[in-house]
Amino acid sequence: MSRIPLTSIEQQPEPVRQWMARRGNLKVFRLLANAPHVFPGWTQMVDELFESPTFSRRMREVVILRVAHLQGSRYELSQHVGIARNAGLTDQQINAILDTDHPDAAGFSDTERTALDVTSELCTTHRLRDDTFAAAQAVFGDEALTELLMIISCFYGLALVLNATDLDVDATARFQP
């Protein structure tokens, strides 16, 4: 049970209700809607991250699963493992992402391995070494690297909220990317 009560979907403004319905009417949205001055902007950012052509669904899910694992976010993992499969990740690759020490052992592309390295280092040390940053910048360029960092920060921050509030995993509802 969440440490903060979940809002009622019916009491939300129509645009928020529509967004929640489109994305799956999840408990996480009912939790975050407790911040009505911030939630609409957050939903817009999430939409932009999922609709941006910069990264494939597969790449986004590689990053999201790694963040969720490193942050111990049971909720994010429960929502995104299925999405990752639908985006083309194999169970072997998903298990490798969830392996703290060796996420690169399952046939990831060089670009995916670079994203995993950036995600792992940033989530565990809260910084990027110069060589890691330079390698990522060479692979992604400034625009895509910035977007990658924004994906990491979005799901890292969300994991903190979910872990702090101890939000229960939805029984059946799933996120609709």
Residues covered by each model-derived region:
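Hydrophobic alpha-helical segments
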Residues: 1-177
